Amino acid sequence: MKGNEVIAEAAIRCGCDAYFGYPITPQSEVMETLMAQRPWEESGMVVLQAESEIASIHMVYGAAGSGKRVMTSSSSPGISLMAEGISYMAGAELPCVIVNVQRGGPGLGTIQPSQADYNQATKGGGHGDYSLVVLAPASVQEMHDFVVLGFELAFKYLTPVMILADGVIGQLMEKVVLIDQRPRWTNEQIAEISGSWSTTGKAKNRKKHVITSLEMDSYIMERNNLRLQEKYDQMKAEEVRFEAIECDDAEYIMVAFGSAARICQKTVQIARKKGIKVGLIRPITLFPFPEKIIAEYATKVKGFLSVEFNAGQMVHDIRLAVNGKTKVEYFGRMGGIVPTPDEVEAALEHKLIRG
Amino acid sequence: MSVVADRINEIIKPENLVYAKSPLLNDDIMHYCPGCSHGVVHRLIAEVIDEMGIQEQTIGVSPVGCAVFAYNYIDIDWQEAAHGRAPAVATGIKRVMPEKVVFTYQGDGDLAAIGTAETFHAVNRGENIVMIFINNAIYGMTGGQMAPTTLIGQVTATTPNGRDVDLNGYPLRITELLAQLPGAAYVTRQSVQNPAAVRKAKKAIRKAFEIQAMKKGTAFVEVVSTCSSGWKLNPVESNKWMEENMFPQYPLGDLKDSSRADAGLYSIKG
């Protein structure tokens, strides 16, 4: 199946309650697949095409207030429009899943794949001090799995979760193992999970619930911020996910996520045939970033190469983790160009080994 | 006991009660200025929800603007929306919980400027929600700047020489525009300048909530309102200014009273 179609299929099967979205290339198949599947007839899942990405994310905000599982998807320019609503959801501590199938920017940019929204996704993307859990799928299977995982994390931390895919993964066709259809949560389950904060109508035996990110008292607002930061610290302690490939004996390590990591896997094979001991660290969570494993290898290897489809964004997070202990270089292409494994191997030799 | 206390005790006997605060309004002192219409409209909404017995089903969506704190006063569940996005937020709530009662409460900047797109499309979809629109022709919370509904010649913080058509365009009669949309079931313009008007406004708000229960489409109630602080007039002068200047531009009355249009009128033939 195609990566974008799998997002829709996983949403239906994991019992998602609602999807709100607006068409944008290269991810329009998500909503098209949902509309073709007509899940409202089977499970009652709501699927609605909004008038804009702004409206989509605020529909998600409203629907998430009910304690139900709600999601949207878009691509880079659309995610910029959603930044307001994502910030509000982070501030109001509402769970949801947001898929960004990235394309090249800035501006209208291109419809070709890119990873240029790394900073936007991992540093919050909107105004205020907040972070999202950011999951970076490198296969169609992970597109599927991260929808399911995304909802788990969204409700564990009461936070928006972003699946940061790119045009390659969105359009890629691969075999995928789908989960069995799960029922949507019942009202009783929702009451148990979210009953302490959800706005479903004020029952006689409880105080009114108000979902807001507003607080005029600076001392309380600071406490709210500290609570968010504690949450992010807990994510850093408990949710870091990565894959380390052939790193045990490595003299050099490449760091790459999403489709760039797929290319680097091939580069590892090519370089090792040449006798270059290179490994690959693939961050699966971009926030929380796998800084510990990188810091550990920083004292063991001769250098890191960050490979990204952008101008060098993740490289800064690697440098922070490495903290000056070894060399950190960047190689990437922009504008929708996807480099070949040989091109990456050449950069590895040129920038890191001989550079 | 003083004579005064005796008299007060005589007066507050239950059998003398002719009017009481709605049980849905709490005792918090409202932050609204003297002469502001918000307090009256809050009271009407609280009364309607109480009288219809829908407190446990109702979710309010408060805006950005003076009424951002509406959630402090009416004892129901609330979601506070970003500036202008209340109709989208209400859409999200209503779509996943169609059995609940959902309303937005928005000012003119929120509903008719920054949130114009969300307003139009929610009404055009015929969302089964109630929208309460407070039009006082000025931005109250940010300190009295020009609103989309500010009248020509009206002085505000950003139109110190009065609103100028060449520079600022025209006052937006958004309610007339919304009445044209097939998704609208009930569109009305009310005010609360005297007891008779307050009674009519309450009837309109109640009707709007009843229309939601009947799933007839969007019910939209504009309330032409005062902003004494923004207009720099006392409450009595504000009412007079509203009657003399606002009512001719924003005439009161029903603009649409039916239900959302039959899809057949808009369908392809083949």
Give short role names for the model-derived ranges.
Chain B
Residues 1-140, 203-207:
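Thiamine diphosphate
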Residues 1-18, 27, 213-270:
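Flexible, low-complexity linker and terminal segments
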Residues 20, 147-214:
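Conserved thiamine diphosphate
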Residues 57-60, 100-103, 128-132, 176, ...:
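Structural motif
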Residues 64-66, 136-138, 194, 223-230:
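Glycine-rich beta-alpha junction loops
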Residues 76-79, 122, 147-151, 237-240:
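Short, hinge-like loop/turn segments at secondary-structure boundaries
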Residues 116-121, 141-155:
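Active-site-proximal loop->helix
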